[in-house]
Amino acid sequence: MKVLTPAALILLFFFYTVDARTREYTSVITVPNGGHWGKWGIRQFCHSGYANGFALKVEPSQFGRDDTALNGIRLRCLDGSVIESLVGKWGTWTSFLVCPTGYLVSFSLRSEKSQGGGDDTAANNIQFRCSDEAVLVGDGLSWGRFGPWSKRCKICGLQTKVESPQGLRDDTALNNVRFFCCK
């Protein structure tokens, strides 16, 4: 039986500890109507290939109390794995919507502008266009409006911007998202 050299052990350790945050990407796609509250989570990537579906974490209307609407986005990768970045604490996950064939190539975010002294929700829903031209509209809420479509690319990762709970002040949860593109 051959004994591994220290260099071989280090390389072996490196390849087994590479995770979904370390994949190389070629570009980032964004849209101009994301909210500004919160902090960016960590980047998450499909281990290989691209994303072909998504699910949303949505808090339904609170009927006059503090609404947050969209709290999280999960991507389903072609290999069946699921990735997510930072997620808000409210709501439940919807079922996955998946491209009939192909993968996700662009997105449009539904957001509500600042309500001044009223109840802000920021991002409410998202829709994606697939490489086969199908459009998948998320099961989020209908406040605000969908903004412009992003540029097109092969989506392989995401990073979300989420506001942490504000105690007795107004909560918004998910405010913005950026998607990463791979070759």
Curated annotation (Swiss-Prot):
The keyword Disulfide bond applies. Belongs to the VMO1 family. The keyword Mitochondrion does not apply. Residues 1-20 form the signal peptide. It is found in: Secreted. Disulfide bonds join 46-77, 99-130, 153-181, 156-182. Keywords: Disulfide bond, Secreted, Signal. This is Vitelline membrane outer layer protein 1. It holds the Pfam family VOMI. Exact function not known, component of the outer membrane of the vitelline layer of the egg. Seems to be able to synthesize N-acetylchito-oligosaccharides (n=14-15) from hexasaccharides of N-acetylglucosamine in a manner similar to the transferase activity of lysozyme. It comes from the Eukaryota. CDD domains: VMO-I. InterPro entries: VOMI, VOMI_sf. PANTHER family: VITELLINE MEMBRANE OUTER LAYER PROTEIN 1 HOMOLOG (PTHR18841:SF2), VITELLINE MEMBRANE OUTER LAYER PROTEIN I-RELATED (PTHR18841).
